[in-house]
């Protein structure tokens, strides 16, 4: 967490850090705790090729899977693995969301993994310029994915989120506020109070504010909660795990 009191992270990356896995292999980070879950960030597999209907169809294709070692990169590897594919089974490109969208529009890649709250600007822009499709995940492979990586949540992206794109089943990770353990209980309590006592105002000022929900906020399992957050949620009737 560095010098910041609190930052926003993702449930999968938090788990990697706390357990010393993947990009944190051999270097576990234990000095932070969960404050609250905010909203879901969906794994969106984007293509302009109507013949790519399943993750299995990505074999042999040119696919952007995010910067090497990034959270998106590991999300892509997890989903490929659920379909018995590896990084070597595709022509992997390591691009950010904007460059991936440009490459899709120009026909330079066949598909891209984008992990962000839907609607995502890069995909919205692409869908207005070119026929765009989201590649869905089926129940069998979602279950397989969750067995090895329980921080993935099933999620259905509604029809109309992007122009011409039907309802699509995928998975998501949770955008979460975390805090250093040495931040005072009162400070973290006040952060929770400020967010969740102003949900109506936040919903009016930001699309993601509409997704704020107390029960969801208290649902993180990847990393225990800060004592200040636990105090706030207890007042609202929710017990959360602490260190």
Per-region residue spans from a language model:
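Short, small-residue-biased leader/transition segments that mark boundaries at the very start
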Residues: 1-7
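Mobile, glycine-rich extracellular loop/lid and propeptide segments
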Residues: 3, 18-19, 49-50
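Pocket-lining segment of extracytoplasmic ligand-binding domains
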Residues: 11-13, 21-22, 87-178, 183
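Short beta-strand-centered segments that line the small-molecule binding cleft or hinge
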Residues: 16-19, 30-37
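Extracytoplasmic
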Residues: 29-32, 40-42, 60, 129-132, ...
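Bilobed "Venus flytrap"/periplasmic-binding protein-like clamshell domains
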Residues: 40-106, 200, 215, 219, ...
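Ligand-binding clefts/hinges and TM-proximal coupling segments of bilobed small-molecule sensing domains
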Residues: 62, 68-78, 150-222
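An extracytoplasmic/periplasmic, membrane-proximal ligand-sensing/linker region
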Residues: 95, 99, 105-106, 116-118, ...
